[in-house]
Amino acid sequence: MLRDPGTMWHTVVGQRICETGHLIQTDPFSFTQQGQAWIAQQWLGECAMAVIHHFAGLDGLVLWAAVILAGTFAFLAGRFMRAGLQWPAAAILLVLVIAASSYHFIPRPHLVTILLLTLVTALLCDVEAGRVSMRRLLWLPPLFVLWTNIHGGALGGIATVFLVQMAWLLRGVPEKLGPSEITHLWHRRPAGGETGETPVPQVNPVLIATSLSLCFVAVLVNPYGTALPRVWLSLMHSDLLPRIMIEHAPLRFLSTEGVMILTLAAVYLGLLAATWRRGLRVTWLVPLVWLVLACSRVRHGPLFAVTAAVAIADMLPHSPLPAIFARSGSTLLDPARAAEAVGLRVMAVPALLVALVFGVQTAGIRCPLIGAGWCRLDPSYWPVEATKVLREHLAAQPEDRRVFNDMLFGGYLIYNAPEARVYIDDRCELYRDSGLSRYLELRDHPERIEGLSGNAAPRLALVRSRSQLRRYLEGSPQWSELHRDPTASLFVRKPD
């Protein structure tokens, strides 16, 4: 889980906010953008990470990431079993959902987006099915205030709510005008094969309009005002991000995550097709939107997975599958034996266990898996040894703090070498396409590093040992090698 630089620099941002009592408004970490406007768009999540790190370090961050994920998938498992799936079948389906999401299990604020989108989709399903009152939609605006200040995935959540509620409003128009083929799409027939249709709950346009309006206003309830959603939109429109960051790249269908996502998509689409003739609900179509987004940017894959899981659980009792299982004598899917909803009391034991583990970590007690010091950064992936040499060099020559670095190493240096100033890191909204393009040029044409001058000229270079940059710097008369290991190499520019 500790293979993403965001885990580290997000924590440092939260530490600075907590220590100073002020939000960050300009870049404090790089020498290429120093003093330029930059907002900590995930400030609340970053502060939470800083507090956890203060008490339990990286162990605590991994623990609470696991807690968020465990809570999300336990919630989904509960919905599967309340739909009539018995635990063996629910476990198999849950494993598929986890497999389609696991490549993005990283201790970062985006995990909250996975959890909250799951809850929002479930709420929309419950409202449309009539299981809860439509007044529950008024819970969404305060939820989006919290979500907005934790992670930009709130934009996707609001888009989901907007699409569903607008479809509900549009559904009401043909119903008032009279029967039509469109009307039949928004009704469901009972699964028992009875004729006739049972309409979904009556739409309340005033309540929907109020909920939607407050959700949009909720996005502006943040310390940065309209600047925050503008940053989200700028990241969506970047043409370079898919080239430079794997999580923004299109889904590779033959990759492990691609196969898992497509397998889950096949299950979802097959169930949707089988249930379609019995009636259709708007919320059952939500995963289609996220599937398209996942194909365009792989980072959306977990969001497709959790919305698909919620929709599958909602569709199962209305599909032909219960009758098919009954005819075969199987009880793996039997809505009549659906599990009862559990109360908050069942969470007491897991909560106590989490508190116990966090207490062990906070106390610094060393023991396998749950103790302090168990989580370490992999020196075969991160420049652990090279950074030690870099810090020793900066202690002797602090004026050399401008470091050209591989983009992957930027967040690591921000966390582990705070006295250094990086050339780039993965805060792409700060560097914009122009800065990302310059980095790509230097990466692909290492000789151009000699053209950097003035405040843009690095004094040190920390690059991957198997990169073109390392090979160029090794042969350049302008640079001298200070350290090399299989992971990273450190160079210093020779005096003019």
Regions of interest found by a model, annotated:
Residues 40-50, 230-263:
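Juxtamembrane membrane-water interface segments that cap and precede transmembrane helices
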Residues 63-83:
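Transmembrane-helix motifs of polytopic, lipid-linked glycan transferases
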Residues 76-99, 114:
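Transmembrane-helix signature of polytopic, membrane-embedded enzymes
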Residues 97-101, 136-152, 214-219, 288-294:
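Membrane-interface alpha helices of multi-pass inner-membrane proteins
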Residues 120-136, 202, 268-275:
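Membrane-interface transmembrane helices that cradle and orient dolichyl/undecaprenyl
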Residues 126-145, 206-210, 284-287:
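Short hydrophobic alpha-helices at membrane interfaces in multi-pass membrane enzymes
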Residues 325-395, 408-410, 428, 440, ...:
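Membrane-proximal, lumen/periplasm-facing interface regions of secretory-pathway glyco-
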Residues 392-433, 454, 458-465, 491:
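Short periplasmic/luminal acceptor-recognition loop of GT-C membrane glycosyltransferases, typified by
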